[in-house]
């Protein structure tokens, strides 16, 4: 089909996630994905960004190249810290969102500035995943590296910079180390903890509080960067923040480059989500997010007040325990994922009183980092593989429903849910979701929605008009009455401590006071589940987490 089009009439979208780089080539008129390619990323929480650049080149080649591409935009994993010296050289391997060595740094920032102040100014409360906390860690633990920092960028910022023809002095990049050409967008910048989604500007005081240095925004393509004459004490350069369809410039080959976006914001674009839509993404971990024009203010830190990629807001809640819960069920039951789904469907709603509290890796919402998973309400009568499988699916979805409630407490309304991610293909997940959620659930076809969202942004940048692309649905699930949530709450919320929030001084979530015996009768047993119960995840082929410090994969 691409051969029937004139040269350079297509658009490309890139999803540079934690584990891989994916490229889609799209017809801008219809949104049809014509070609695609991918390449793996190195495993780890510290990665040389040059590996991402190599993977991008490989993925572009696998997608058939960009000879017929008129515009491209890059979305990517959020929060990662890339530091550049005055010659554009990466100072140290990037610290990814999943590098949590900066936990103490995040807590120190909250203690110094206050959770309420952070929310009022940045819309979020720092956690270890956020860029500002990583900068504080770098300042305190690697002062020599910190002293060399001339610019700070996020993963998608740096890749866009390279795509524009920039690079370190030691490379063959035609534009050289032009730090003034660094760009970002509001959705990605809002995950740093030194950018305000409210004002759309950097908060340089918060940057100084984190890193102990002054900063300024990149001046843009008309400025001249001279690495040899830049004083050592010059302010740190932060990428210029572009509007939702503002051009970053052109590649050396003449391809228009869009502003890019954070992964969840790009997914919302790819899905065509709007006010009243709430996206529930079930990958390795989970995210719940919804585009809105409302101001978001949650001092507990559970709901991150991020910016969206279309000029609005994207309140987001992350849970650590999503599709990996299904992996654990498969290991525990010594069954395949297909068999676990069949077992779960053979049980009744509520698993005959058996409840899983699914905190296998602690939890982020509520903030219980040291919690473990538990099977509650176990009796001789309900101790069957079918009930265990059902309890695991219900526990996973109830955790996401808690995230949904946290988002809705910000004043949002919900008309429909969009269920995406690898686990959305699981028939038991789809069926049990009807017992957990109280509004209709649309299940879109499996697709690379992050990359498609980036392609949609590229088309928007190219034409000046946001395209309307059809998203095909494979199912619409209608809710049915049940007491599953009530049963779950009776056990899960007995775990919620008074400080179960990101902010140390925030109280118990409003719905945490359910009576501990609600919905369950009789003498029961509790089983605590610990240890490594993970396996290769058939349901979590999404590989990056959501922006609140638990990036969930959102592509299909």
Predicted segments, located by residue:
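Active-site core segments that coordinate phosphate-bearing ligands/cofactors
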Residues: 12-13, 110-122, 136-182, 196-209, ...
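Short, glycine/acidic-enriched loop or turn micro-motifs at the edges of active sites
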Residues: 18, 30, 102, 188, ...
